[in-house]
Design a protein with these regions (language model features):
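Metal- and O2-centered redox machinery and metal/ROS homeostasis
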Residues: 1-128
Length: 128
């Protein structure tokens, strides 16, 4: 079974979540978007160290966050990120970059129309 197949139900659960539903419709607040991006950045602070430089999202997430309200730190993201330290992060990288490459391409145009920054979903290397 592929990782995609194994996580398909989780993806659908995210889309059915209240915040996920608002995000997909572009109805997320700037504060919610900041909090979401902060959690992504927390995870990328661990994952990006194991990836080629062109895959790094930390600087792009920092740029996106710089124009948003101050994010509220997520204990869940901090705990999950700490659990990744010292372990193979291939699976986490797959999920994070899949979210940016697939979901981000769908949601970025919607969120950008609302003035919410989405530079973290732009990849210089289209094969990344």
């Amino acid at each position: 079974m592929s990782l995609y197949e194994a996580t398909k139900d989780l993806h659908h659960a995210c889309e059915a979540h209240a915040l996920g539903g608002r995000m997909s419709k572009g109805n997320v607040t700037p504060q919610e978007w900041a909090d979401w991006l902060w959690a992504f950045r927390c995870l990328h602070s661990v994952v990006d160290q194991s990836l080629p430089a062109h895959m790094a999202r930390d600087g792009l997430l920092a740029a996106d966050l710089s124009v948003l309200p101050t994010a509220r730190p997520s204990k869940a993201a901090l705990t999950f990120a700490a659990g990744l330290v010292g372990h193979d992060v291939t699976g986490a990288a797959y999920v994070l970059h899949g979210a940016h490459r697939s979901g981000g391409r769908v949601m970025a145009p919607i969120l950008s129309k609302r003035g919410l920054p989405c530079s973290h979903v732009v990849y210089i290397d289209n094969e990344a």
